[in-house]
Amino acid sequence: FDVFTKNGEIYGFPFRGDYYVMYYNKDIFDAAGVAYPSNDWTWADFEETAKKLTSGEGANKIYGAAFHTWQACIQNWGVQDGKHTIMDYDTGYDFFKPYYEMALRMQDEGTVQDYGTLKTGNIHYSGPFAQGTVGMMPMGTWLMSVMIQKVKDGESNVNWGIATLPHAEGVEAGYTVGSMTPLAINAASAKQDAAWELVKFITGEEGAASYAKNGAIPGRSNADSIAEIAKMEGMPEDAAEALTVKNISLDRPITDKVGEVNQMLGEEHSLIMLGELSVDEGLAEMAERAAEIVG
């Protein structure tokens, strides 16, 4: 509730939570003779393994990994340790730098598909992974239900697994990035009492159980709800361990001007990934523009 509290007032109750994990294609790992990811991988492990998984050329190429085009799929790793947020522009956003360097390095080496191709093709975030053309992809827990349904409907035959999100050296395993979705009551509502009963139900234990049975992580998450999700038909083995995390840093803090800053970070992200700005130039522009936005 602290996330949705300001000046002592609660402005919303969390009913759903999502966070990033790492999806992987077991068949691609098996074909390369590489052991499946553990729940204590570093980003260096991720990058090195992507090289081992990459194979083929042209239309038959298998990419070792994938980063979707959202800026979150690079910038989130900079706030994963909980020490910074996207509003910490006074640092010059230096905490993003290692991850931009990693992504560009992998792009140059051909172990991930290049940003420009994904962007111009307007490729859905689930596309490359569901098609079986990438070995690993960091993505939110919302993809679990998507993959279950795609496999069930025959749209995908990927033999997939999940692992806890990789972390930086010196950061404890189980640290990830995510967000909470709140429910709130309109102050102008003529049915405040009825709305409150609905909010209590959805954000309470019964609502949490219902969300878990449908593969969504409830705001009121605990070992029981994780176990419920993990035993769903179509979920990979050992999912419960991968989903048991120690800390979830917010991808976007709830504060003034965060929406405008986030939009700006997306614009600069594209310029860096397309090579129109160097990493240092892009980070400097981010910091300068964020300071102007916040005022």
Specify the residue positions occupied by each region the protein language model found.
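Hinge/lid segment of periplasmic solute-binding proteins
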Residues: 1-19, 159-163, 231-234
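Alpha-to-beta junction loops
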Residues: 131-139
